[in-house]
């Protein structure tokens, strides 16, 4: 395809997103109030617990096989690289702009955590449906393209999503140090703090020399081993609370695990996946539910952007203009350039296959705006809500340009 045709193909999904976002924006107006704060919160819960797991489960089970899984091994690595490079760029923005301490975690999160859900889910099908598109047959393009996107979403939820929350809560540090200290205490078998009182109370008795029989010695050693295991158990529980393992296994993650099991085990796959599968109705129902994820998330985005446009939110925000510019430069210039260097370098080293669609999805992960769930997190933690709304307003306003220019360049690069 010519460069102009690639540009038109890239602009169509952006226009679709803008149209649906404008509907959400209108529904969130005070005069309409169909998508107010409470409505967005409830709709977000439906997306989190119903739509997203259905989408990931149906798309991933349909496209994953042993061969495709081996071919896509670099996908979760690439997602982790976007997080690491974005975190580094966010740290550089903090060093240069010197924002208030309570906003540092938010800035790092906005630079590190990209929208690997809504945007690729809209962009890939729209490009695949384009007549004479750069990725060949539209049906195969959409099937495998959506498989790539859902796998990247799964990797995002598992390896990045909770890390991003920890960045936000701890302002970029604290949690990792706590994990390190707890781990060192377990490995070194140091005493638990709750035992210090009993140690101090028995200090005088420990100075007395006592003759202990061999049986008593063995019994004392057994008790010591039990105490040691109890200590290790306490440390493991403490670490699990820090990492919040329950939240890592979110509905979308559980759906992805089930989808992988169904897709990789041939008897289960033949029962559910395929036009002649006896339980095809399960796959069709999940697909029908999953199709509601994209418009619902985009409507929520439109409602959240309204908050950033209100003067009261802008005035109450402590975010400097230099911080906003730093986030924009990091996300829309430095991160995509880093992605081009990494993905093309991986291709030269035979770490990535030559399939254009696969490389395009890998590159697209570096060019998307910040994740929309950051706004939900600020509401949950009750801090940085106004600042997050302002950042989202600017980043998603410029995303119309970024998600047209960069995908055009990516398609030209890989085809």
Swiss-Prot record:
One of its GO terms (cellular component) is endoplasmic reticulum membrane. Residues 35-44, 97-106, 162-244, 307-322, 377-389 are cytoplasmic. One of its GO terms (biological process) is auxin-activated signaling pathway. InterPro entries: Mem_transp_PIN-like, PILS1/3/4/5/7. Disulfide bonds: none annotated. It holds the Pfam family Mem_trans. Residues 1-13, 62-75, 128-143, 266-285, 344-355, 411-415 are lumenal. Keywords: Auxin signaling pathway, Endoplasmic reticulum, Membrane, Transmembrane, Transmembrane helix, Transport. Induction: Up-regulated by auxin application. Expressed in seedlings, rosette and cauline leaves, stems, flowers and siliques. It is found in: Endoplasmic reticulum membrane. The chain crosses the membrane at residues 14-34, 45-61, 76-96, 107-127, 144-161, 245-265, 286-306, 323-343, 356-376, 390-410. Its main location: endoplasmic reticulum. Belongs to the auxin efflux carrier (TC 2.A.69.2) family. Involved in cellular auxin homeostasis by regulating auxin metabolism. Regulates intracellular auxin accumulation at the endoplasmic reticulum and thus auxin availability for nuclear auxin signaling. This is Protein PIN-LIKES 4. It comes from Arabidopsis thaliana.
């Amino acid at each position: 395809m010519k460069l102009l045709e690639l540009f038109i193909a890239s602009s169509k999904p952006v226009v679709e997103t803008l149209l649906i976002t404008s509907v959400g924006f209108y529904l969130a107006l005070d005069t309409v109030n169909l998508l107010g704060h409470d409505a967005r919160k409830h709709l977000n819960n439906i997306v989190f617990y119903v739509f997203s797991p259905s989408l990931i489960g149906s798309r991933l089970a349909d496209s994953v096989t042993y061969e495709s899984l081996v071919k896509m091994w670099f996908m979760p690595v690439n997602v982790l690289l976007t997080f690491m490079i974005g975190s580094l760029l966010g740290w550089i923005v903090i060093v240069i702009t010197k924002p208030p301490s309570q906003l540092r975690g938010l800035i790092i999160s906005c630079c590190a955590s990209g929208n690997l859900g809504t945007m690729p889910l809209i962009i890939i099908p729209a490009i695949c449906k384009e007549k004479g598109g750069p990725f060949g047959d539209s049906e195969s393009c959409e099937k495998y393209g959506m498989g790539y996107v859902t796998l990247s979403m799964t990797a995002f939820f598992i390896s990045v999503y909770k890390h991003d929350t920890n960045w936000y809560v701890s302002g970029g540090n604290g949690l990792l140090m706590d994990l390190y200290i707890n781990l060192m205490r377990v490995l070194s078998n140091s005493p638990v703090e709750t035992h210090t009182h009993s140690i101090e109370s028995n200090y005088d008795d420990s100075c007395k020399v006592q003759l202990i029989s061999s049986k008593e010695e063995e019994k004392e050693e057994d008790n010591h081993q039990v105490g040691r295991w109890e200590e290790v158990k306490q440390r493991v529980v403490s670490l699990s609370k820090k990492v919040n393992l329950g939240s890592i296994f979110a509905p979308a993650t559980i759906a992805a695990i089930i989808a992988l099991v169904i897709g990789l085990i041939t008897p289960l796959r033949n029962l559910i996946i395929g036009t002649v599968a006896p339980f095809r109705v399960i796959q069709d129902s999940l697909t029908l539910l999953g199709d509601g994820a994209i418009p619902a998330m985009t409507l929520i985005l439109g409602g959240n952007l309204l908050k950033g446009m209100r003067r009261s939110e802008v005035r109450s925000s402590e975010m400097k203009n230099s911080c906003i510019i730093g986030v924009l430069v990091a996300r829309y210039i430095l991160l995509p350039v880093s992605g081009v260097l990494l993905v093309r370098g991986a291709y030269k080293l035979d770490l990535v296959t030559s399939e254009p669609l696969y490389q395009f999805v890998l590159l697209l992960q570096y060019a998307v705006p910040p994740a929309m769930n950051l706004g939900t997190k600020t509401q949950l933690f009750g801090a940085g809500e106004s600042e997050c709304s302002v950042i989202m307003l600017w980043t998603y306003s410029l995303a119309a340009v970024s998600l047209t220019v960069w995908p055009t360049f990516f398609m030209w690069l890989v085809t």
